[in-house]
Every structure is written in structure tokens, then in C-alpha cells.
């Protein structure tokens, strides 16, 4: 039976919760499309987050890995296309670290692309009434750090897994503390993650559908 590892983060930047972990942990132990779902929390800390993820990858040997993170200000589930090899933190992480213009992996590739069927996921999410889009940037904070670290590990540690990253909006309770910022209900995010998992397990190839942006 396939194993799907889904990760979320602990809260950061003085938020009381992180919607990624609140949604992800709901799926732990469930069976989706014939696969076992395993969920784990990652620390919002440069370096340590990748080390924790690496240990999980080596012990679980999952078939699919979907990392999920909070993106306050976004209004949709953002299915990330690419991870870039740079840390450039606008704020400090949960350990007080704030790397600037630093390679995640010295001498590593400039970028890695998601191996999830990102456009098919967006298509299925929209069909189910969940706002979603392909995102062209995962930022340069710990989310991109983990996304890059995940894809680098898959490429270099002999893992036969597909992987990628999904950003999600604030929860409504969080958005109440950030007037004017969009949010997405917990149940909608959980349903969206189930769709993303199901679509990934069902499709080995992505669909051809416009998902780019002009700027």
C-alpha cells in the first residue's frame, strides 16, 4: 500500500496557530485512494526543518510527499511549481535565525520543479469549488527552504517519490487579527488536501492547461 507523507509547520511570527498543521494533522492515519496517510509537524526553523524531514524520508520511504505551509495574504490554495536555492528571510525563524542571500545547498541546482501533477490538482480543486491556482514562487522563507530540501533529498538519496509544496491562506480566526487579509475555512483546506492527494495518486502525468501568470 502506498504511503503519503504530508507535513505542516508549527506557528511562527506570533501567530497562535499554523493553519497548515491544523489541516494536515486531521488527515493522519486516514486511508485516501488506497494509500496510508502519515502526517508530521516540521519546525519553522532553517536547517532543522530539513534535517527533520530527511529523517522522515529515510525512515518512512514514502511514495508521495506533500509539504504544506501558511501563506498569509493569499486567497487560494497555491500549488507551488518551483523551489529555488536561496534563503532570504524577511523575518527571523523560530530559532531567531535570519539568513540573507544564502544557498540552501551549496553548489546545488538553482531550482527544482515540483513532481506533483500541479495543474491537474488545480483543475480538480476548482471543480470541487475550492479556490486554487498554480503559484510561481514559494517565497524565500522556511517554506521554500523545505520545498527545496525535499526535492534535493528525493533527487540525491535514491528515493522513488514524488513531491511538492502547497501554500494555504490564513484561517478565518487569524484573518480577524489581520484586517483586510483573506482566509480559508479549515474544512475547505482539509477537503482540498484530500483532493490534492487523490489527484496525485491517480495521475502519473500532469494535464496541459494554462496556469501561468503575466507578472
From Swiss-Prot:
What top-tier enzyme class does this entry carry?
hydrolase
- Coiled-coil parts of chain: none
Question: Which Gene3D superfamilies does the UniProt record give?
Answer: Peptidase C15, pyroglutamyl peptidase I-like
Source organism, top-level taxon: Bacteria
Where exactly are the transmembrane stretches of this chain? none
The annotated active site, in chain numbering, is 80, 143, 167
Query: Localized where?
Result: Cytoplasm
Its Enzyme Commission number? 3.4.19.3
- A single GO BP: proteolysis
A GO MF term: pyroglutamyl-peptidase activity
- A single Gene Ontology CC term: cytosol
Which SUPFAM superfamilies would you find in this protein's record?
Pyrrolidone carboxyl peptidase (pyroglutamate aminopeptidase) (SSF53182)
> Does this UniProt record's set of keywords contain Hydrolase?
yes
Q: Keywords, A to Z? A: Cytoplasm, Hydrolase, Protease, Thiol protease
Its recorded reaction(s) are: Release of an N-terminal pyroglutamyl group from a polypeptide, the second amino acid generally not being Pro
- Family per similarity comment: Belongs to the peptidase C15 family.
Enumerate the HAMAP family for this protein: Pyrrolid_peptidase (MF_00417)
Can you state the subunit structure given in the record?
Answer: Homotetramer.
> What job does the chain carry out?
Removes 5-oxoproline from various penultimate amino acid residues except L-proline.
| Name of the protein described by the UniProt record | Pyrrolidone-carboxylate peptidase 1
The organism of origin for this protein: Ralstonia nicotianae (strain ATCC BAA-1114 / GMI1000) (Ralstonia solanacearum)
Amino acid at each position: 500500500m502506498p504511503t503519503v507523507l504530508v507535513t505542516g509547520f508549527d506557528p511562527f511570527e506570533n501567530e497562535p496557530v499554523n493553519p497548515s498543521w491544523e489541516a494536515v494533522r486531521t488527515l493522519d492515519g486516514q486511508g485516501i485512494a488506497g494509500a496510508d496517510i502519515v502526517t508530521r509537524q516540521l519546525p519553522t526553523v532553517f536547517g532543522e526543518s530539513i534535517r527533520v524531514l530527511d529523517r522522515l524520508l529515510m525512515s518512512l520511504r514514502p511514495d508521495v510527499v506533500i509539504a504544506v505551509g501558511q501563506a498569509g495574504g493569499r486567497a487560494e490554495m497555491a500549488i507551488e511549481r518551483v523551489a529555488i536555492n536561496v534563503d532570504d528571510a524577511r523575518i527571523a525563524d523560530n530559532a531567531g535565525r535570519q539568513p540573507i542571500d544564502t544557498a540552501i545547498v551549496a553548489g546545488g541546482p538553482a531550482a527544482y520543479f515540483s513532481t506533483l501533477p500541479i495543474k491537474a490538482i488545480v483543475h480538480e480543486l476548482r471543480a470541487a469549488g475550492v479556490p486554487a491556482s498554480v503559484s510561481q514562487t514559494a517565497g524565500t522563507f522556511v517554506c521554500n527552504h523545505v520545498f527545496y530540501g525535499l526535492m534535493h533529498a528525493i533527487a540525491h538519496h535514491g528515493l522513488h517519490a514524488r513531491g511538492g509544496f502547497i501554500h494555504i491562506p490564513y484561517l478565518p480566526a487569524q484573518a480577524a487579527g489581520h484586517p483586510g487579509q483573506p482566509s480559508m475555512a479549515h474544512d475547505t483546506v482539509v477537503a482540498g488536501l484530500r483532493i490534492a492527494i487523490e489527484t496525485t495518486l491517480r495521475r502519473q502525468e500532469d494535464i496541459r492547461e494554462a496556469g501561468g501568470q503575466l507578472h
